[in-house]
A protein has these predicted regions:
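Glycine-rich beta-strand-centered segment in the early N-terminal region that forms part
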Residues: 23-37, 47-97, 102, 154-158
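C-terminal hydrophobic helical "lid"/dimerization subdomain
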Residues: 1-2, 270-274, 278, 314, ...
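Glycine-rich cofactor phosphate-binding loops and adjacent beta1-alpha1 units
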Residues: 182-186, 208, 221, 225-306
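Short Gly/Pro-enriched turn/cap motifs at secondary-structure boundaries
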Residues: 21-22, 54-60, 133-137, 143-144, ...
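Hydrophobic beta-strand signal
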Residues: 31, 64, 83-84, 178, ...
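Cysteine-cluster motifs in flexible loop/terminal segments that predominantly coordinate metals
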Residues: 87-150
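Mid-domain Rossmann-like dinucleotide-binding core that forms the NAD(H)/NADP(H) cofactor-binding site
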Residues: 143-144, 150-152, 156-241, 245, ...
Length: 366
């Protein structure tokens, strides 16, 4: 057992930083001493009750740190390795075998819902009582994480783990969605709806492909300014402008060939679909409550429009995360412009700032 501290989500939604104990890693697992963890909107979904994760429980799924212990049958990872943590998968189903682990047949229980390891056991306790963990195969809002081997990506020993922590989910999702799914080219008009961490990452990713237009849509002026700084060619302020009319004006009536809705809001998805060009595609991610529906005008999509969903950017973390690390090292992925750091004991302030829109990507330092 390893003693540590963690931010525990209670049944009433409060977050209580508590002393906890971590079991030794089992087969296919490693114990990571965390340096930092990014706060993601999926975490907020749990706190709001929209994602049914058991309580008391530990969430957090953008961990970064160094390996302390290695379980049986783990290959290629050793104590002392610097690592970034992402989502987990089974590695054996058809989706995993075809290098689409975000669509693993057991993705939901392994990452979101059960709070238990794949074998049904726990691993974290507080005052002798079990605490749910294994969120995205890690549960990283604490000093340590028991992480699945398949969620672990090794990085250079001198990597700045605090800066790189958000690569495991938010940035991965933005880049993966843009590069793996939408794949913009020089004749495309791209619109990104929502200028949070996922959306701004998508703006950076799209800008590297140099589409003819790259438009960011949001309600927060400071985020729109940041989108322009990161490569957007135009912005739309949804708090004061008619988004559909403004997009029609910006595109000369052509419409948006590639839209990416990062908000998880059905009204935004409908706006994006209405604004899409003939044979345009709208990609949707986000974590709305189960049962959330999008209203679609069937006549409006008969021009070949496509509405498509995506999870985790359809990315394999062990492939994309090293590319993102290299982009950051080359100065082409300015993560520092998105981040603000908070101590573990100040995690509720980080949550409040993210809700308010004053911080794009809070990073919790362990």
């Amino acid at each position: 057992m390893t003693a540590g501290r963690a931010a525990v989500v209670e049944a009433d939604g409060r977050i209580v930083v508590s002393d906890v104990e971590y079991a030794d890693p089992g087969p296919g697992e490693v114990l990571v001493r965390l340096t930092a963890t990014g706060l993601c909107h999926t975490d907020l979904g749990v706190l709001a009750g929209g994602i049914p994760f058991p309580t008391p429980g530990i969430i957090g799924h953008e961990g970064a740190g160094r390996v302390e212990k290695v379980g049986a049958n783990v290959r290629g990872i050793s104590p002392g390795d610097a690592v970034l943590l992402s989502f987990t998968s089974c590695g054996a189903c058809a989706a995993c075998a075809s290098v689409h682990p975000a669509y693993c047949e057991t993705w939901l229980p392994r990452n979101l819902l059960g709070g238990l390891r794949a074998d049904g056991s726990g691993g974290i306790s507080r005052d002798g009582e079990p605490v749910a963990g294994h969120f995205f195969g890690q549960s990283s809002f604490g000093t340590h994480a028991i992480a699945d081997e398949r969620s672990v990506v090794r990085v250079a020993g001198d990597a700045d783990l605090t800066v790189l922590a958000p690569l495991g989910c938010g940035v991965l999702t933005g880049f993966g969605s843009m590069w793996n799914v939408l794949d913009p080219g020089p004749t495309d008009i791209v619109a990104v709806y929502g200028a949070g961490a996922v959306g701004l990452s998508a703006v950076i990713a799209a800008s590297l492909r140099e589409p003819v237009q790259l438009i960011a849509v949001d309600r927060v002026a400071s985020r729109l300014d940041l989108a322009l700084e990161l490569g957007a060619t135009a912005v739309v302020d949804a708090s004061s402008e008619d988004v559909g009319a403004r997009l029609a004006e910006l595109t000369g009536g052509r419409g948006v060939s590639l839209g990416f809705d990062t908000t998880g809001h059905p009204g935004v998805a409908r706006t994006a679909l209405d604004a899409a060009a003939v044979r345009g595609t709208v990609l949707v991610c986000g974590a709305p409550p189960p049962g959330t529906e999008i209203g679609v005008d069937i006549q409006g999509i008969l021009t070949g429009k496509i509405l498509r969903g995506v999870t985790m950017g359809d990315a394999d973390p062990r492939d994309l995360v090293p590319q993102l690390v290299a982009l950051h090292a080359a100065g082409r992925l300015p993560l520092e412009k998105l981040e603000k750091r908070y101590a573990l004991d100040d995690i509720e302030s980080a949550v409040a700032d993210m809700h308010a829109g004053t911080t794009v990507k809070p990073v919790i330092v362990s």
